[in-house]
Amino acid sequence: MDPFDSEGRALVRESSREHQHEEEEIRVIGEGGGFFDIRDLQDTWVRVQVQAGDLIVLPPKAYHRFTPKGKVEMRRIYATGVDYSAVFREA
């Protein structure tokens, strides 16, 4: 995701909106980094900084958002097959 090109800007807009997935989200950070903000059980934000070489696993239905810190490459690992859908939280 390159936040400096048009496709990257669209991805940044989408990933920075608070959302959840029915399945766990497993990400490997290939290059660059950024911040995952994740809601805890009390609905408070917890910020996790990720960088190249990190692996992060978000539990199913955990509301979260991602903010890149410059250009970032991430890969998603699917535990149960490729079905990527997001449910966005209303403001």
Tell where the protein language model's regions lie, with residue ranges:
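Short, low-complexity, polar/charged sequence segments that are solvent-exposed and flexible
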Residues: 47-48, 55-57, 75-78
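Double-stranded beta-helix
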Residues: 65-91
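Short Gly/Pro-enriched loop/turn and capping motifs at secondary-structure junctions
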Residues: 33-35, 42-44, 55, 63-64, ...
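Conserved metal-binding segment of the jelly-roll/cupin
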Residues: 50-70
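Short strand-connecting beta-turns/loops that link adjacent beta-strands
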Residues: 41-42, 71
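Short, well-structured hydrophobic secondary-structure segments
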Residues: 1-14
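Short, conserved beta-strand element in jelly-roll/cupin
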Residues: 20-40, 57
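A short beta-loop-beta micro-motif enriched in histidine and acidic residues
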Residues: 12-26, 43-44, 50-51
